[in-house]
Each structure stands twice: as C-alpha cells, then as structure tokens.
C-alpha cells in the first residue's frame, strides 16, 4: 500500500516562478515514498495513482501551479482572488499511470507570475496527497 498526505506548516510568503512546493508536515506517509524535505513523491512501484493538491492564496493574489511527473506537466490549477477580498482555495485532482522511480511533485508555473503568498495555517491548509489505486 502507498499513500501520503502532507501540508505546508506555514505560509509561503514570497513564492517564485518554477519553484517546487514543499509540504513539510506528513500526517500520512504509508510506504515512505513522500519526502518532506524535497516535496517529491518517488513511486515505489508501477501503478495507477490519484494525486490531489490544494493551494490557498491570499486575498488580492493569484498562484498558478502544476503537478509534474518527472519533468513534464500533467495537470494545472489557478488559484485567483484578485477581485475579491477573501482568501481563495482551489484543488486539483489527477489520475495517472506512474512507473517505479517516477517523481511526482507540485511546481509553481515557470511562465506565469505569482501575486502575494500561499497560505497555510491551522484554519486552512495548503496540501498535497496521493495514493495508489491499482
């Protein structure tokens, strides 16, 4: 069995373009395939996996993010609260065939700017999770 759930312990106040997001608190890490120091999930074996990631941006901000398999984008989301005075939350979900040794991680988009910060605290968590389906 392989499954993990991790979140950012604190806000990321100044994320840059093309930055790997590190979810440094792993609440679940069955199989120990997620690394809290690097933000990378390394697949222990071939299979079909589901991955989700949730990004919370500050009010009047926006964050583009992508889920990467090795060095290729597999999915993306935009968290945008530019026109509202509240924080904004978006979750991306993908199902992917992943091979042993493949690396899956969340990256800020290399071509899009980021405005304001990524939020994560006791009341709302920016998080990343994945598990093997088959």
Ranges and model annotations:
Residues 1-134:
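Extracellular jelly-roll beta-sandwich "head" domains, especially the C-terminal globular C1q domain
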């Amino acid at each position: 069995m392989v499954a993990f759930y991790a979140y950012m312990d604190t806000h990321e106040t100044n994320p840059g373009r093309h930055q790997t997001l590190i979810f440094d608190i792993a609440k679940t890490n069955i199989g120990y395939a997620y690394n809290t120091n690097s933000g990378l999930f390394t697949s222990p074996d071939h299979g079909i996996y589901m991955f989700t990631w949730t990004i919370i941006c500050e009010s009047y901000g926006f964050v583009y993010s992508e889920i990467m398999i090795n060095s290729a984008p597999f999915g993306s989301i935009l968290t945008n609260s530019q026109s509202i005075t509240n924080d904004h939350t978006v979750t991306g979900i993908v199902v992917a065939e992943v091979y042993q040794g493949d690396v899956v991680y969340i990256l800020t988009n290399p071509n899009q700017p980021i405005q304001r910060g990524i939020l994560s605290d006791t009341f709302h968590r920016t998080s990343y999770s994945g598990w093997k389906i088959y």
